[in-house]
């Protein structure tokens, strides 16, 4: 069974921002290498630390939830950085919402940001349009389905 962990300022951290630092999970990942972990919210403001953990540990995946609602520009920046550092099969979109309306709105924002970032990469000839579609589908569907055993 996978373990979901809220990180960053959305971790309900009793107003102590440092409680959301994913570096505190490093020993947990070392101790349980066969456990699958998914970390939420890109750990803002500890995104660099999060990306380092996701790159190092094969059992750590990331969920992009809530990032677009915090800041569209920040979401674009960090998604671009993610693609520079980490294989896209380690990223999924989960929403982390309480209502259908909230989930729908959040997903619309996520799709817009993913499309914008991938379009820029196609324009810059970093990837072709077919690869962009493959990446978007993986993030929005396939990666979570694989991770949670839905298919």
For each feature predicted by the language model, list its residue ranges:
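Histidine/acidic-residue-rich catalytic or RNA/ligand-binding cores of hydrolases
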Residues: 13-22, 47-56, 72-80, 100-116
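Short acidic/histidine-rich active-site segments
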Residues: 38-42, 86-108
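Mid-to-C-terminal alpha-helical segments outside catalytic/metal-binding sites
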Residues: 88-89, 105-151
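Divalent metal-binding pocket/active-site signature
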Residues: 1-49
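Divalent metal-coordination and catalytic microenvironments
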Residues: 6, 41, 62, 96, ...
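Short, well-ordered coil/turn segments that N-cap beta-strands
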Residues: 1, 33-36, 58-61, 87-91, ...
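Hydrophobic alpha-helix feature that most strongly marks membrane-spanning transmembrane helices
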Residues: 30-33, 55-58, 83-87, 99, ...
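C-terminal structural cap/anchor segments
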Residues: 41-87, 91
């Amino acid at each position: 069974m996978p373990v979901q962990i809220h990180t960053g300022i959305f971790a309900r951290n009793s107003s102590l921002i440092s409680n959301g630092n994913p570096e505190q999970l490093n020993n947990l990942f070392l101790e349980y290498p066969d456990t699958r972990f998914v970390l939420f919210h890109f750990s803002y403001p500890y995104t660099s630390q999060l990306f380092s953990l996701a790159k190092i540990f094969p059992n750590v995946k990331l969920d992009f939830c809530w990032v677009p609602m915090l800041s569209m520009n920040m979401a674009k920046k960090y998604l671009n950085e993610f693609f520079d550092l980490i294989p896209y099969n380690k990223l999924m979109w989960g929403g982390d919402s309480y209502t259908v309306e909230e989930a729908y709105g959040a997903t619309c924002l996520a799709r817009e940001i993913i499309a914008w970032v991938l379009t820029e990469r196609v324009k810059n000839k970093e990837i072709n349009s077919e690869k962009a579609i493959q990446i978007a589908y993986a993030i929005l569907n396939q990666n979570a389905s694989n991770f949670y055993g839905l298919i």
